[in-house]
């Protein structure tokens, strides 16, 4: 991160694609050390499932209401944003309610998810992403958010979905350039055509999917969010280190490592391996 005493020039920043609005967004979502310590509260499906399970434990068998989901997101933002550089929110439940309730501090950055949660899929179960209904990059910029986040599942070996996702990512990237707002792109591998996450064919190709996705897509963002290229305990540590080096080489932008739902000890080891590689 640049500071008044550094030698990083405006020309250098522009060469990295950091125009004034993007640079300001990066500063806003980082802490004083230039570290990204973001909290995600935009996961609608998993949050709805958690609230539904909580209600069942209380003997109430029903779907959570809009108000209950909003309340849960406000509680999360209030509790966790105090120790975060930024909070990631969704447009439907989170952004206005979290900000309007004054539970996101004025010194905490705000990122808004642009993609639709639980969008359509093709005949083999591969995602076909699109904008959150009623939302756009322009709207996210206009409400004063600091950055846009785009989650785009991507599988190079499934051409129908891959072509659709590629075009959608390009569109969001161009919109972010037009409106001068920072873009964080998150690509994830996915099972399709009857696979599950523990299916051997998915496990076997995941590392290559992660690396190839970075090679094709990392140019269309300012910060790239990548999955760990492999599985702890499946591939050897030496193979995983090789995969991480290939991922680093493939990514055309600074990248961060997604936790992708693993527990903290596993994620800690993944981060340590990524740093060493």
Language model features with spans:
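Alpha-helix N-cap and loop-to-helix initiation/capping positions
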Residues: 60, 64, 68, 127-128, ...
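Alpha-helix-loop-beta-strand connector modules within alpha/beta enzyme cores
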Residues: 102-117, 165-185, 206, 238-257
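Alpha-helical scaffolding segments of alpha/beta enzyme cores, especially the outer helices
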Residues: 71, 75, 135-138, 164-178, ...
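Catalytic-face loop-and-helix region of soluble metabolic enzyme cores
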Residues: 223-277
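Catalytic beta/alpha-barrel core
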Residues: 87-91, 149-153, 158-161, 204-239, ...
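Conserved anion-binding
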Residues: 154-158, 165-220
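Alpha/beta catalytic barrel-like cores
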Residues: 1-141, 146, 151-157, 220, ...
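Conserved, mostly hydrophobic/aromatic
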Residues: 39, 186, 224
């Amino acid at each position: 991160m640049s500071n008044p005493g550094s030698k990083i020039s405006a020309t250098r920043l522009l060469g990295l694609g950091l125009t004034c609005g993007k640079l300001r967004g990066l500063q806003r979502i980082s802490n004083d050390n230039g570290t990204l310590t973001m909290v995600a509260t935009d996961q609608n499906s998993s949050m709805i499932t958690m609230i539904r399970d909580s209600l069942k434990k209380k003997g109430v068998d029903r779907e959570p209401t809009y108000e209950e989901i909003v309340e849960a997101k406000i509680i999360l933002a209030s509790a966790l944003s105090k120790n975060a550089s930024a909070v990631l929110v969704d447009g439907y439940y989170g952004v206005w309610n979290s900000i309007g309730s004054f539970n996101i501090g004025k010194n905490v950055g705000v990122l808004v998810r642009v993609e639709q949660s639980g969008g359509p899929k093709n005949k083999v179960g591969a995602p076909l992403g699109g904008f959150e209904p009623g939302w756009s990059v322009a709207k996210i910029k206009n409400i004063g958010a600091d950055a846009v986040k785009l989650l785009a599942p991507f599988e190079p070996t499934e051409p129908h979905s891959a072509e659709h996702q590629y075009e959608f990512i390009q569109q969001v990237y161009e919109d972010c350039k037009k409106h001068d707002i920072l873009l964080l792109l998150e690509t994830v591998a996915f099972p399709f055509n009857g696979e599950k996450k523990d299916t051997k064919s998915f496990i076997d190709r995941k590392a290559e999917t992660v690396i190839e996705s970075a090679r094709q897509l990392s140019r269309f963002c300012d910060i790239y969010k990548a999955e760990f290229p492999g599985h702890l305990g499946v591939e050897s540590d030496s193979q995983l280190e090789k995969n991480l080096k290939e991922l680093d080489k493939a990514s055309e932008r600074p990248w961060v490592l997604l936790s992708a739902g693993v527990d903290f000890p596993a994620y800690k080891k993944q981060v340590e391996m990524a740093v060493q590689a």
